[in-house]
């Protein structure tokens, strides 16, 4: 999936995460994380974001995430939404997304 514009999903409320996806001129994914629980869960948060991007077929993007204690399912949902918005995709492949949980 090609990232065409900057897009945001989520909020800065407690138990949520704000994910911003930006286009990148170079191949690869960069994740910049800000979290009060980064020492305990930073590696897991990055892993969820990176795996979600991989499933979506994103090859080049810069991601900024501001975490406020979000669960993995919330991180995944916010990442999916931000990527679809950034790629200007209006149709979700729910069967494909659901198959990730198998």
Curated annotation (Swiss-Prot):
Q: O-(phosphoribosyl dephospho-coenzyme A)serine modification sites?
A: 14
Its predominant location is cytoplasm
Please, which domain of life does this record's source organism belong to?
Bacteria
Which InterPro entries does the annotation name?
Answer: CitD, Mal_deCO2ase/Cit_lyase_ACP
User: Is the Membrane keyword given for this protein?
Assistant: no
Instruction: Please give the family membership noted in the entry.
Output: Belongs to the CitD family.
Q: What function is annotated for this protein? A: Covalent carrier of the coenzyme of citrate lyase.
Entry protein name: Citrate lyase acyl carrier protein
Which source organism does the UniProt entry give?
Streptococcus mutans serotype c (strain ATCC 700610 / UA159)
Q: What is the lineage of its organism?
A: Bacteria, Bacillati, Bacillota, Bacilli, Lactobacillales
